[in-house]
């Protein structure tokens, strides 16, 4: 049954803030839900099939609730609310983005941008070992680094240790030209990039020089006990089973460890089993350890990245067997 419904908002400015004053976002809503949207002054008119109008109204209600909670609604927030309603998810936009991580008094807090990101932050708060597993661009490493910096600022830990396997060099760094820093920097640059977004340049330089923040390849963790530290292992899908066991057994007193990886992007030789795959199976029932899985819905890079990941997943999935 076709229906026309008008929603009234407190002011034209309040209404415009719900779609970032970008009429293209309303066109996205029309195309996604199959409704006609007309907006003037402080009202919006929805026309279409009743259940589709219900969904469109729910999108605006989600956005309005988030606005009243102080959320600055931009393109990502609008599209997230639209996608959640389109897929009949139960995420509340305002609740999701209320999860904030403060890393610097001079930089805005980092905000969770999906339900899984929120669950990930909460898991890190509550557990000493957390696995964050999913595709690129879902914020696994970025949020882990933010939580580590926040913990350091609050003096909950004395240092941050960021590590990843230099699988491209087979971790045989001694064969590469240059001093240690020159050898390892290319493999660790994504971790440095995350730090630069959260710390002032002088603050980051001071922390690195004092080794309050240490960025090192996984091979350099062997034989150490990592006390009073926030440890992040990035690109964990490229650890061997021996390397993963080695790192997890380095964790000392008053320490946290976050392990991030994408099990669809394993670059190890065919005869090597990924350490993170084994760990996920072996540790799934161990108290104090949590695992959060991300999907393409959590991608916060360019909007095309989500579509690219989905297309590749569909392309790589085995075709159903034909019936004879």
Please annotate each region the language model reported:
Residues 1-16:
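Short glycine-/aliphatic-rich beta-strand segments at the starts of folded cytosolic domains
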Residues 27, 33-36, 40-42:
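Compact, well-ordered interaction domains used in eukaryotic information-processing assemblies
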Residues 38-97:
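Interdomain "pre-motor" coupling segment immediately N-terminal to P-loop NTPase/helicase cores
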Residues 82-113, 125:
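Proteins enriched for Cys/Gly/acidic motifs involved in redox and nucleic-acid/cofactor modification
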Residues 105-115, 123-233, 237-324:
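Conserved helicase motor core of SF1/SF2 NTP-dependent helicases
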């Amino acid at each position: 049954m076709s229906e026309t419904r008008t929603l009234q908002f407190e002011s034209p400015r309040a209404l415009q803030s719900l779609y970032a004053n970008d009429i293209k976002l309303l066109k996205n809503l029309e195309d996604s839900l199959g409704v006609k949207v007309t907006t003037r002054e402080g009202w919006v008119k929805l026309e279409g099939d009743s259940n589709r109008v219900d969904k469109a109204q729910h999108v605006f209600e989600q956005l309005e609730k988030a606005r009243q909670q102080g959320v600055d609604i931009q393109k990502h927030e609008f599209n997230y609310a639209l996608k959640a309603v389109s897929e009949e998810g139960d995420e509340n936009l305002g609740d999701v983005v209320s999860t904030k991580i403060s890393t610097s008094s001079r930089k805005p807090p980092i905000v969770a941008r999906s339900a899984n990101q929120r669950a990930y932050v909460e898991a890190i708060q509550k557990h000493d070992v957390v696995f964050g597993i999913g595709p690129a661009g879902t914020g696994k490493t970025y949020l882990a680094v933010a939580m580590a910096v926040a913990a350091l600022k609050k003096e909950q830990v004395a240092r941050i240790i960021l590590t990843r396997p230099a699988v491209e060099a087979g971790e045989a760094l001694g064969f590469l030209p240059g001093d240690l820093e020159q050898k390892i920097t290319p493999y660790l640059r994504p971790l440095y990039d995350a730090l630069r977004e959260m710390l002032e340049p002088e603050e980051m330089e001071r922390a690195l020089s004092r080794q309050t923040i240490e960025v090192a390849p996984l091979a350099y963790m062997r034989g150490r006990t990592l006390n009073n530290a926030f440890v992040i292992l990035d690109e964990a899908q490229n650890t061997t089973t021996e390397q993963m066991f080695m790192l997890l057994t380095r964790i000392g007193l008053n320490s946290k460890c976050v392990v991030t990886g994408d099990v669809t992007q394993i670059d190890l030789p065919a005869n090597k089993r990924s350490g993170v795959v084994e760990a996920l199976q072996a540790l799934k029932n161990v108290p104090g350890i949590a695992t959060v899985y991300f999907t393409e819905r959590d991608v916060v890079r360019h909007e095309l990245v989500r579509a690219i990941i989905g297309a590749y997943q569909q392309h790589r999935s085995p075709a159903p067997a034909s019936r004879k």
